[in-house]
Amino acid sequence: ASSSGPVQPPQELEVSTPAGRLSRFYQQWSIITNNQLVLDWLKGYKLPFITKPFQHTSAHSVTFANRQKRGMGIAINELLDQGAVRICSPCSNQFLSPYFLVQKANGNNRFILNLKNLNTFLQPPHFKMEDIRTVSRLIKQDWVLSTIDLKNAYFLIPVHKNFTKYLRFQFEGHLFEFVCMPFGLCTAPFVFTKLIKPILHLLRSKGFVCVNYLDDFLLLSETFEQRKSDTAFTVQLLHSLGFIINDEKSLLKPKSICKFLGFVFNTQSMRIELPFKKRQKIFVMLQNIRSAATLRIRTLAQFLGLLCSVCPAVKYGWLYTKQLERDKFLALQMHHNNYDARMSISSLSLQDFSWWSYNIWSGDNNIRRHLRS
């Protein structure tokens, strides 16, 4: 694909903070799309409640141990610096949610607003997302690949001023509210996917071969020079629309081997495999579950979900999850669907664990084979 064409990405604007950043690039967006819903979101996303949210009791301030409190304080200060949250005053019909921290891959903490209760007042529409199957259908022998990872993706979308009161939390006697889209909002994946559609349409109209999953882009082409040119154009286009590229997580220099959506694709061998860290994580979990006399049904269900997610890269992996699924089903039946009840692993499942313990290190798969399963 040539990066020349009638539509050239406009120049990037200088904007200091990431929160709600896309709103300052409205003019550039209006060049590539006339979708009024998308353009309205850029002015401020209005949460599409099916009924007006209410709380019988507000979420109380959570008490943390000193170490947790320090970590929470650091995370909230980072949100303030990014402009993602602001201190606010109480108002009628506000909605307060609890929150917690999760550790990111780099060891830093990410603040998560627990919007489980608020999400009951929202109903995200059904929509399709591109995934590993999309990649497997497009990829060809000896093609070169590059990836682009977007930084602070959800935070770039502004929330309309009339709806920030539903995204509030308390910490150390202060009241805060998100002014941009937080993690945990059930409609966020739909909004972000629809927001990216005009970009994909433009790229594909110019002949680019690309796949997108939320904040991750994969670009594919036949030659190194073509992919280098296409990648440069795509990066410039994304910058011009207000997106921030995460250089550390992106692979901007095209290669025949790259990681995308938690898998490693190799176009020379046309194989798909797992990164070392994911293999290691599964192996450790296998050993822990194997050595435990009993475990919660929930723990097995989570582990099963992880095993199923990696099966595209482990040949015959699906076959060695069936007995575990049966163990889970029988345990839930016995304990009246109580996922917190304890269970033991059957001898047949322990045999499957032995298979996984070996194949998690040696296994890979033909890129197209899993499409037939």
Where in this protein do the model-derived segments appear?
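Reverse-transcribing Pol proteins
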Residues: 1-127, 174, 211-216, 314-345
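Conserved, non-catalytic sequence blocks in retroelement Pol enzymes and Pol-derived host proteins
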Residues: 61-71, 85-93, 105, 121-127, ...
